Amino acid sequence: MKILFVHQNFPGQYRALAPAVKAAGHEVMAISSRKETDLGGVSNVTYEIKRSSSKSIHPWLVTTESAVIRGEAVHGVVSNLSKNGWTPDVVVGHCGCGEMMFMREALPHARLLGFCEYYYLGKGSDVNFDPEFPSAADAPERCHARNMHLTESLLSCDWGVAPTNWQADLFPENLRSRIKVIHDGIETDRLIPDDNAWIELGRDKVKLKKGDEVVTFINRNLEPMRGYHQFMRALPEIMARRPNARIVIVGGDKVSYGSPPPNASGYKEIFLNEVRERLDMSRIHFVSHVPYPTLVKLLCISAAHVYFTYPFVLSWSML
C-alpha cells in the first residue's frame, strides 16, 4: 500500500511507526512543514504557508484560521502528488493543527486515520487548574472555538487514535466512539537500565554516574503548565535534606503552552530568583536541551525523576 503520514513536525508521534511501515514493504511518504527531503529514511514533501493570519480576525478564531491555512497548504501538496501519479491508500495524520481538515476532499477514496491528542475543555482539565495562573475570563469560549477544526478533521476521518484513555475521554461521546486508544509506544530496546551509564556536564565538568544522588526534571520548556514553579519551590528543602544531591534540569526558557510572563520570554529566571538565596547553585545544573542519547543516559543515572503537569497531554519524558 501507499501510506502518507502528515504532521507539521514529522516524525512527531510517528518516529517509530513510519519507518516500521516502510520496512514492512509499503510505500511511505510524509508531508510536513520541515524543509528536509528525508526524515529518518522517509521521503518528506514540504508544505509552505503562503499567507499569515488576519490581523483583524475575531480573537476566538485565530487558531481556527491558522488551521484552515495549514489545511489549505496540505490540500495543495496532496493534490499535486495525486496529479503526478502518487495517490495514497491510507493517510495517517495529526488532527490538531488543521493539516487533516481538507484531506477527504483531496483524497475521497483514501482511508484516513487521525491522531487525537487533545480536546480542549472550558473546565475539568487545564483551564483554571492552577489558581496562581487563572485563565482568561473567555477561556471556555476560546476552548470551544479551538476545537472546531479538530472536530471537523476527526469527522472526516474513518477512525481516530489517542495515546491514553484520559486523552480519548476528553472528546464528546459522539466523537469518542470513533477513537481507539493506542499508545505511541516505548522503545524498549533503547530505553533500558544501564548500570554503566554516566554523563559529564560540559560547562561544570561534573561527572555523574549510576548511584549518585541525581534528581532530574525534564521538559521541552520550563513553564507552569509542566510544574516548573512547583519544582523550584521544592528545591530548597530537597537540597537541605540531601546535601549530596545534584539537580539536573533539562528544558528551554520559552513557553510551549499558555501565555508568556510579562516582560519576559520564559519563566526560568522568575522562579529561580524566587528561591535562589536558599539554594546551593553549585549543585544545580541547567543544561537547556540535550541530544536524545544524552537524555537516555541522564534518565539511566537519575535517582529521582520529577514530573509535574496540569491535566494535559502526557509528556514523553514521563514515560
Predicted segments, located by residue:
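N-terminal subdomain of nucleotide-sugar transferases
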Residues: 1-43, 161-163
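Short N-terminal targeting/anchoring amphipathic segment
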Residues: 2, 78-97, 103, 111-113, ...
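A conserved catalytic-core segment of Leloir-type glycosyltransferases
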Residues: 30-81, 85, 273
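Acceptor-binding helix/loop patch of EC 2.4 sugar-transfer enzymes
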Residues: 51-61, 109-148, 189-200, 209-210, ...
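Acidic donor-binding loop of glycosyltransferase active sites
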Residues: 158, 300-313
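Carbohydrate-associated surface elements
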Residues: 166, 185
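Conserved donor-binding/catalytic core segment of Leloir-type glycosyltransferases
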Residues: 200-226, 232-237, 247-248
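Nucleotide-activated donor-binding/catalytic signature segment of Leloir-type glycosyltransferases, i.e.
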Residues: 251-255, 259-293
